[in-house]
UniProtKB/Swiss-Prot annotation:
It comes from Apis mellifera. The gene is Mrjp9. Expressed at very low levels in the hypopharyngeal glands of adult worker bees (at protein level); expression peaks at 12 days post eclosion. Secreted into bee venom in the sting apparatus (at protein level). Expressed in the brains of adult worker bees peaking at 12 days post eclosion (at protein level). Expressed in the spermatheca of adult queen bees (at protein level); expression levels are higher in mated queens than in virgin queens. Along with Mrjp8 expressed at very low levels in the head of worker bees compared to other major royal jelly proteins. It is found in: Secreted. This is Major royal jelly protein 9. The lineage of its organism: Eukaryota, Metazoa, Ecdysozoa, Arthropoda, Hexapoda. Coiled coil: none annotated. Induction: Unlike many other major royal jelly proteins, not down-regulated by the ecdysteroid 20-hydroxyecdysone (ecdysterone or 20E). Disulfide bonds: none annotated.
Length: 423
């Protein structure tokens, strides 16, 4: 084969790849499957009598149950519900029973933890994390509605037997912004080097801080940075022509196991930032010496929850776009390298939770590229404005294969896909 013919073949291959990129990207949302959906949330109370008693006492009010996060382990699907009046349980699993609103929830690990007498149980959980040691890390902010009722805490369960492994209260001076008196820990990111050498990075969305927990000695440190604070230009959110306002700081975070970069952004901003966690885990560090990096105004809307794949594809909800965006950390952090990989004005209204979960297959040919992205969407604009229609589907859990979402996009790793460098 002559040199010119080889280049001609290469040229047409690149053109075909590029055309596939632009024709397929519009159909990425169809890759997502709705795994669960609800008009409203209800619970398996054990009997109709107990359910009616919960309604009459005000323990349960279907209008006040808002989902935030999802995670999966060994066939169990976890869902978190923000604690408020009428929310009987914040940490739950989806049962196989169906109610009028959708699948019924069951408290995890049991109802006694949901009752939370004398702050011995669980108050309110935004997000959770599961590590490679089959441990469920629960970040409890201790807030019900707008009221602080219990200390913030980390609760760890052994998923193999649902037994408590650890329950650690976050010290008051760590959990709270000493200037404003505000606190709201919302996102835990777990970094496990081994069973004991485990670190947890915690976002304080209202106190504008990153809290670091060392599992080995139960120590905490609170860090502050201008990158954790909201941008006043971007406190207004608009989804499907409906607006609301938030002054939210650091919220969505994701940890790359290859680079050990912790990616994050203040929710009410258009920024994307990161900090390398080796600064925290490899010896003592001084807060003033921490190097925070990233790009300001790189996004065109606010970004919500985040998760990162093994190949370095960082996913994040794009709020006003009702879309899922991504960027591969093996590419320069430039706007041209950020893609929308799925968009749907109905099913992707405010992505509040994202996880990337490996799906084990018995087929040897499917054991690679077996990562699935799981997301929660909750129509937060209607929650904020109090105009949810409980006669229609409001809340969804969806999933999709990561490799199919990023195929023929700039979110593919350029080191492993030759043609992606031309996209």
């Amino acid at each position: 084969m002559s040199f010119n013919i080889w280049w001609l073949i290469l040229y047409f291959s690149i053109v075909c790849q590029a055309k596939a990129h632009y024709s397929l990207r519009d159909f990425k949302a169809n890759i997502f499957q709705v795994k669960y959906q609800w008009k409203y949330f209800d619970y398996n109370f054990g009997s109709d009598e107990k359910r009616q008693a919960a309604i009459q006492s005000g323990e349960y009010n279907y209008k006040n149950n808002v989902p935030i996060d999802v995670d999966r382990w060994n066939g169990k699907t976890f869902v978190t519900i923000l604690r408020n009046d009428g929310v009987p349980s914040s940490l739950n699993v989806i049962s196989n029973k169906i109610g009028n609103g959708g699948p019924l929830l069951e408290p995890y690990p049991n109802w006694s933890w949901a009752k939370n007498q004398n702050c011995s149980g669980i108050t309110s959980v935004y997000r959770i994390a599961i590590d490679e040691w089959d441990r469920l890390w629960v970040l409890d902010n201790g807030i019900s509605g707008e009221t602080s009722v219990c200390p913030s805490q980390i609760v760890v369960f052994d998923l193999k037997n649902s037994k408590l492994l650890k329950q650690v209260k976050i010290p008051h001076d760590i959990a709270i912004n000493s200037t404003t008196g505000k606190r709201n820990v919302v996102t835990p990111i777990v970094q496990s080097f081994d069973y004991n050498n485990t670190w947890v990075y915690i976002a304080d969305v209202e106190g504008y801080a990153l809290i670091i927990y060392n599992n080995a000695d139960d120590s905490f440190q609170r860090l502050t940075s201008s990158t954790f604070v909201y941008d006043p230009r971007y406190t207004k959110y608009t989804i499907n022509d409906e607006s609301f306002s938030l002054q939210d700081g650091i919220l969505g975070m994701a940890l790359s196991h290859k680079t050990q970069n912790l990616y994050y952004s203040a929710m009410s901003s258009h920024n994307l930032n990161y900090v390398n966690t080796k600064q925290f885990t490899q010896g003592k560090f001084q807060a003033n010496d921490i190097q925070y990096q990233g790009a300001s105004d790189i996004l065109w809307t606010q970004a919500s929850a985040k998760a990162i794949s093994e190949t370095g594809a960082l996913f994040f909800g794009l709020v006003s776009d009702t879309a899922l965006g991504c960027w591969n950390e093996n590419r320069p952090l430039k706007r041209r390298n950020i893609e929308i990989v799925a968009k749907n004005n109905d099913t992707l209204q405010f992505i509040s939770g994202i996880k990337i979960i490996k799906q084990i297959s018995s087929n040897i040919y499917e054991r690679q590229n077996n990562e699935y992205i799981w997301i929660v969407s909750n129509k937060y604009q209607k929650i904020a404005n109090g105009d949810l229609n409980f006669n229609e589907v409001n809340f969804r859990i969806l999933n999709a294969p990561v490799n199919q979402l990023i195929r023929y996009t700039r979110c593919e790793n350029p080191k492993t896909n030759f043609f992606s460098i031309f996209l």
